[in-house]
Amino acid sequence: METPAMFIKRCSRSIFLQVVIGLVIGVICGVGIPDLAVQMKPLGDGFIKLIKMLIALIVFCVVVNGISGAGDLKKVGRIGLKSVIYFEILTTIALVLGLVVAYSLGLGSGANIHLNELPAGDVALYTGRTQEIHGPVAFLMGLIPTSVFSAFAENDILQVLLFSVLFGSALNLVGEQASGVARLINEFSHIVFRIMGMIVRLAPLGVFGAVAFTTARYGVDSLSHLGALVLVFYATCLVFVMAVLGSVLRLSGVRMLPFLRYFREELLIVMGTASSDAVLPQVMRKLEHMGIRSSTVGLVIPTGYSFNLDGFSIYLTLAVVFIAHVTGTPLAMTDLITILLVSLVTSKGAHGIPGSALVILAATLTAVPAIPVAGLVLVLSVDWFMGIGRALTNLIGNCVATVTIARWENDIDMPRAQAILDGRLEAPAKADGEPLKRSAVAGEGKLHG
């Protein structure tokens, strides 16, 4: 039987257990001492800001190191094209699933809420910002930074990714003459990852602060309001993860449950902070540790964070149909097709917009004349809870995408991946912060560090 001393020792070595404890204490504090708990919000916000502080540098280091040592630049382009095609297919499936579930269940039907009963003030906060969502040409132009420094200063990951791909490609083409620069960036990445390891140690504190504030602010029973929407959303996300993503992962030779268990610490942090940004560096590191080439991880994950938003896609069509039903708006087949087509465009505009979920939802409602935009206020009270599901599903979707594309490209050491997922090889050290390296030939060599 485990003694208290043994349990404390085990907790001191496990970030996973520390995060669980932080989450539980956060709930207790939120229920028992709400006045104090609401003041804990800066702990969660501060943790996320510390993580975001390094994301651009980590993306730069991982992508440059991966591409400069990849050898074949045509392969890099091929991975990028396959990623975009994969993202479009999976997000379309997610959009259709949300639409079909909400419509077939009649989600929100019978509420008969009148538009004059809805407060317009909160809606204006989001509808007034829909101009931030640009068309395709403006979006593509927005990928080009004003300067290299502005991309890093504004933490615009897509702009950083573009520069990183160009920089890594140039290093690759220059070859031996630039070997000193390549070594310098590789050594710099060790420093960045060491800092990240120090920050990750603060995850339990960040989760505690975020959960304590949320419990005190919204209450344990706050899900009862608009509970059907929240429950159906989570059920739909679960079906998507286990059935759709599970099937995709199975085709790659990996089972979903061991895969989720491997990322359990990251999923817990996302659950506590409602932000998948908080775990991006750790996720990239673990995917490399599984045996996936660093250049593939460095291309797929940052791009997926903007284009492969499966959880957000489910939320978008589900919420639009819900708002139509609760406001008594009849939906014809042409309306459903319009919702789907509009969502295919607006769902790609979420990158870099604060409060993006509600802003994109407002933009979608604005583009579908049949549905009143004022209905947006109906989902405001539960948006934070749905945000947890969005972030979890988005994260899992991007991890699955990386494995799938790596499998297509033969960029994953499958025996190593299976050994790690089965527990025959250890996961990377919990917070040592060291970047992982892999040989340039897919399927050969081992991970080090």
From Swiss-Prot:
PROSITE patterns documented for this protein: NA_DICARBOXYL_SYMP_2
InterPro entries xrefs: C4_dicarb_transport, Na-dicarboxylate_symporter, Na-dicarboxylate_symporter_CS, Na:dicarbo_symporter_sf
Location in or out of the cell: Cell inner membrane
Cross-referenced Gene3D superfamilies: Sodium:dicarboxylate symporter (1.10.3860.10)
Keywords tagged on the record: Cell inner membrane, Cell membrane, Membrane, Symport, Transmembrane, Transmembrane helix, Transport
One Gene Ontology CC term in the entry: plasma membrane
Bilayer topology annotation: Multi-pass membrane protein
Transmembrane segments annotated in the record for this chain: 16-38, 53-71, 84-106, 157-176, 197-219, 229-251, 311-333, 358-380
GO biological process, one term: L-aspartate transmembrane transport
GO molecular function: fumarate transmembrane transporter activity; malate:proton symporter activity; succinate transmembrane transporter activity
Pfam family, one: SDF
UniProt keyword Iron-sulfur present: no
Function: Responsible for the transport of dicarboxylates such as succinate, fumarate, and malate from the periplasm across the membrane.
Record-stated family: Belongs to the dicarboxylate/amino acid:cation symporter (DAACS) (TC 2.A.23) family.
Protein name in the entry: C4-dicarboxylate transport protein 1
Lineage, highest ranks first: Bacteria, Pseudomonadati, Pseudomonadota, Gammaproteobacteria, Pseudomonadales
